[in-house]
Amino acid sequence: MQLKNITGTITLLTGTIIGTQGYIEIGGNDNPTVRNPLTNEVYIPGSSIKGKMRSLLEWQLLGYDEIAKNKGNVHACNKPDCPVCRIFGRSAGKELDETSGPTRLIVRDAFLTDKSRENLKKLKQVKGFDTEIKYENNINRLTSEAKPRNSERIPAGVDFEFSMSYKVIDDKDKQNFDKVLDALRLVELDGIGGGVSRGNGQVKFEIKVDGEKIDVQNRNI
């Protein structure tokens, strides 16, 4: 078995909502930013990154009909060569084919770079907080009544260090690694966190694979 190490930075190009509820619904309760309970620093959970990578890759590889047939649930099948299941894993407890082996991709939490940590400390000293509040309104089409809400966002320009590891057990895994890079590019084209369709969560990846710089922006998606 070979392990590929993916390391690098995630740069927030727009304010990003990484909330404790996992998504934002206009008119709902405020969704505070996820923080390390020991340091109170913002971070991006590995599950948020991996979940978005998987979701977008499912749309690309499986298409609407397959996703609709599964009623929008996470894809899991008994095909040993299914790239989605091999890369991201299958749900525990399902009676599925075991020949594909363990989950190949491990995605770890992404933490602030030293520079961004200092920048947010300075922001908190000046403004009293290290995040920003974005105000939104849901307008009733008949009465024009506005229902305001606010969302806490990590500001644009903040960088996070991230790391992933990918198990290569056979030749199929070598082929599927390109799909991991495709998934990262898809996240760049879409976004991460809540309210992506309303301008939140645009990101850029700078990555190295086993120490070699890889430009995912040039991938043909």
Regions found by a protein language model. Name each.
Residues 1-132, 147-221:
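RNA-binding basic/glycine-rich loop and surface signature characteristic of RAMP-family CRISPR effectors
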Residues 136-149:
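Short amphipathic beta-strand starts and helix->beta connectors
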